[in-house]
Amino acid sequence: MLDLTQHNELVITQQVEHLEAFVGFETANRYNIMTEEGQHLLYAFEESGTISRQFLGSHRPLSIHVVEDGTRHVFTAQRNFFWFMSHLHIRDDSDKHIGSLQRKIKFLGRRFDLEGPDGQLLAEVRGRLLRPHTFMIHKPGGEEVARVTKKWSGLLREVFTDADTFRLQFHKDLDQDFRMLVLATAFAIDMDFFENNNKRGGFGFG
């Protein structure tokens, strides 16, 4: 399996189908994960129902599968349908539960809790009100250990598609499991905060 500890910066780019871009029909999310230099490392794809994508929007139940070389499984992030606060569970290639991501209520910003397999708090993901595209990941003691930033994709790409690009930065001492949790965090941020339900269909829950 790819050793994520060898990469302290990654870029995630979303792939958008022409049907979704021009008609607004919600298709399953797909992402390329690469180095800052553009070297392809991993591929991620959503598994969900067509009807739930159209009518439940960003609240739909789904799984995100991350694979290497097209077939080798790296990890899966899974969540059930939710009304208010999403809860994403992450399992590695051996189906071991390595942690979860729980969205929390925050009135002046955005927040997730990163939890270990036993529910212990590993880190807080904080998005400030005045910096809506930057999410900082802090250990309980306050040290920032990772960051997820939504990058500007260009005017036409931003206006006519929902395609997003994210930059991930890791502290050099983070282990493999924690880096997988940060990758899953980027997917959750995209689905919870940057999916355009008005264009993508759905009842506009979130």
Predicted regions and their residues:
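Low-complexity or membrane-interfacial segments used for flexible interactions
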Residues: 1-63, 72, 79-86, 93-96, ...
